[in-house]
Amino acid sequence: MKKITVTLLLTLICSFAYVQAQTTQPSQREILRACIKVNDYFMEKYADYTATSNVGRVRPSNIWTRGVYYEGLLALHTIFPREDYYKYAYDWGSFHKWGMRNGNTTRNADDHCCGQAYIDLYNMCPSNPEMIRNIKISMDMLVNTPQVNDWTWIDAIQMAMPILAKFGKMYGEQKYYDKMWDMYEYSRNTHGGKGLYNPEDALWWRDADFCPPYKEPNGEDCYWSRGNGWVYAALARVLQEIPADETHRNDYIADFLAMTKALKACQREDGFWNASLHDPTNFGGKETTGTSLFVYGMAWGINKGILNKEEYLPIITKAWNAMVKDAVHPNGFLGYVQGTGKEPKDGQPVTYTSVADFEDYGVGCFLLAGSEMYKLK
């Protein structure tokens, strides 16, 4: 009986220690250490920023996956400036002549994504307008043509929407904000018949293929984690740029708040989110990219006073601590990253040791999350 009591006591102590570790807000030093470790691993492995990727076919290094990475790197640079970070980003943009994969006439948001990093680099030292010339030409083309139906998959909202917001702020011209809303509103309310956003669940179908009657194996709608993470991050990045009196600011905030509530409800017990937000049986398990994007958005919302800190700080603390504990390897490799795709079954397997087909965007998402976690008071 005495042995059973001691064993039970030890179990309770260990359980308490685990819960406490999950919910203890990390220090800035700890957050920075994790970000530096993950980024240093990537920069060492991919030291040649000019190298093409050869997954299925040859792609240049300014595609969306790398653009997302540089968004994260430059966010890290803002909280921990290092010359090698800046040089790694600047030299990459310079190598590509500050251009996009398919030139200035592309309407493909995946091509536009690199423009976010180009603009961020330009804003750090606005002495060379060539850095933003090409991406501005492409955005002006969107603004000056009537089409609004380019963002037919929700990833596109993150890849391109913040660029229009950045130019609206930079030039003080409403036309960028207006076009941004028109394209967002079409994706939200019209594409696929009734739009890609389901206001009942406050989550998004990835593209028209997943609109009803499509269902997950458990009968629920298919809400892909990373896809919803892209929209959630985009809303944060847009709200960061637009003025308080922008016509549709309250609409964006309403969607951001609704998504936040929905995401809170489907967080896993261990702190991560599943690849499928409403069907944990469909390739369920820890997944780092969606989790990182949700942490980024919620941390940003807390930092800006849009989200209640008391309610949401425990959510993101649990998620961040879980990623650092379970996904970050001692050498900085980032595990549980789902490979490229459009739904839960793609990019599998997702494990501690699995290497995604592209390693860059997962690191970028993690750095975005860490950079906002660092700013928490």
What are these regions (language model features)?
Residues R33, K37-Y41, V148-N149, D207, ...:
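Surface loop/turn signatures of beta-propeller and other carbohydrate-active proteins
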